[in-house]
């Protein structure tokens, strides 16, 4: 912020503008996934994502950051809903709680590793010409491009194209997935997969509204919590903040797979999604209202565990409750509501930080 003269209002705009392009490209990206297949589409997303991240190294002013955020929204728009849909095409419904949880576990692992690493890079990799934050984006962006290239060569589009499965295994898996799709279709008489027909489903609208609210809180925390944590003590360095921010995600690394497994074992999704949301809300209130440092840290842990543990059970709901014919569009629509929530909450918090 100091390097480029970014004000709190600029920061709010930078945080929010991402969600505009993220929102706009949700549905087109899901269509692209279906047209081109997972291997080509997801690898392209990852390569573009990494390239834009790395190019932030050369940013000269606020406008460059705003432009980068717009393009990050374009590329990121299709990744998460694409992966949720991709996993639903590979794993039976009874296993999707733990499968989604293990996929989301990457968020916790990345946060545990990235938070202290980012703080260290920003603090120690300063050169006369390039500040630490620039090196942070370069170090994160370049490996992502190479991972995208590997994805193109290694990711199969569907179980039928998996070289490591025998014909018998492929047949058994495809038959099981077909049975799950028939069960889900029986709950939804509307087989019209057009966009307008899909989004009129009241179940989809309920799922989308709930996701918008919880993701608004999560996305706001991603941008604003490090500053709040640094305000816990005047003695905290950037490295200290990174280490503290990794604590809740360490606990989440253990809670997420267990909670997803428990959801599968009980074959129950709704309460397994709702209870972690409640825990995250309690954590937020503790961070904001409790003066004790130890209780604030406990609240931070509640937030991290809750905000990540709900993912697995929640994302098992769309494939169980919505029509398979419109599932890709449904997942993209739900995720687009998170970007709307993120845009509104970041603009609101920017206003509050300036005037209050």
Regions found by a protein language model. Give the residues of each.
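Conserved MFS/SLC helix-loop-helix module at the cytosolic interface between two early adjacent transmembrane helices
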Residues: 23-63
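Central mid-sequence intracellular linker of multi-pass
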Residues: 93, 103-105, 128-195
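Glycine-rich segments within core transmembrane alpha-helices of 12-TM secondary carriers
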Residues: 97-129, 141-144, 335-345
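Cytoplasmic membrane-interface "Motif A"-like loop-to-helix N-cap segments
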Residues: 34-46, 264-277
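Extracytoplasmic gate region of multi-pass secondary transporters
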Residues: 194-260, 311, 315, 345-349
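Helix-to-loop junctions at the C-terminal end of transmembrane segments
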Residues: 25-37, 122, 254-268, 353-354
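C-terminal transmembrane helical hairpin of 12-TM major facilitator-type secondary transporters
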Residues: 265-317
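Helix-breaking motifs and short loop linkers at transmembrane-helix boundaries and internal kinks
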Residues: 5, 37, 58-64, 75, ...
């Amino acid at each position: 912020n100091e390097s480029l003269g970014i004000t709190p209002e600029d920061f709010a705009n930078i945080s929010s503008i991402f969600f505009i392009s993220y929102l706009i490209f949700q549905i087109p990206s899901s269509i692209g996934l279906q047209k081109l297949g997972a291997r080509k589409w997801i690898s392209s997303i990852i390569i573009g994502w990494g390239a834009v991240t790395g190019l932030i190294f050369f940013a000269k002013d606020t406008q460059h950051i705003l432009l980068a955020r717009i393009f990050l929204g374009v590329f990121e728009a299709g990744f998460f809903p694409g992966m949720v849909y991709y996993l639903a095409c590979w794993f039976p419904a009874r296993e999707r709680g733990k499968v989604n949880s293990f996929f989301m576990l990457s968020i916790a692992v990345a946060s545990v590793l990235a938070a202290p690493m980012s703080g260290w890079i920003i603090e120690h990799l300063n050169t006369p010409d390039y500040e630490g934050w620039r090196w942070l984006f370069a170090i994160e962006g370049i490996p992502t491009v190479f991972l995208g290239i590997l994805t193109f060569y290694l990711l199969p589009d569907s179980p039928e194209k998996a070289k490591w499965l025998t014909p018998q295994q492929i047949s058994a898996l495809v038959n099981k997935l077909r049975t799950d799709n028939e069960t889900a279709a029986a709950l939804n008489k509307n087989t019209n997969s057009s966009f307008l027909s899909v989004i009129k489903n009241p179940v989809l609208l309920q799922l989308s509204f709930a996701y918008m609210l919880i993701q608004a809180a999560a996305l706001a925390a991603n941008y604003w919590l490090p500053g709040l944590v640094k305000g816990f003590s005047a003695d905290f360095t950037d490295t200290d903040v990174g280490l503290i921010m990794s604590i809740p995600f360490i606990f989440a690394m253990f809670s997420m797979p267990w909670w997803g497994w428990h959801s599968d074992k009980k074959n129950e999704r709704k309460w397994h999604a709702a209870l972690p949301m409640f825990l995250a809300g309690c954590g937020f209130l503790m961070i904001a209202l409790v003066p004790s440092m130890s209780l604030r840290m406990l609240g931070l842990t509640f937030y991290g565990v809750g905000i990540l543990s709900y993912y697995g059970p929640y994302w098992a709901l769309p494939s169980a409750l919505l029509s398979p014919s419109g599932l890709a569009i449904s997942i993209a629509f739900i995720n687009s509501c998170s970007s709307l929530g993120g845009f509104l909450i970041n603009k609101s918090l920017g206003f509050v930080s300036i005037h209050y």
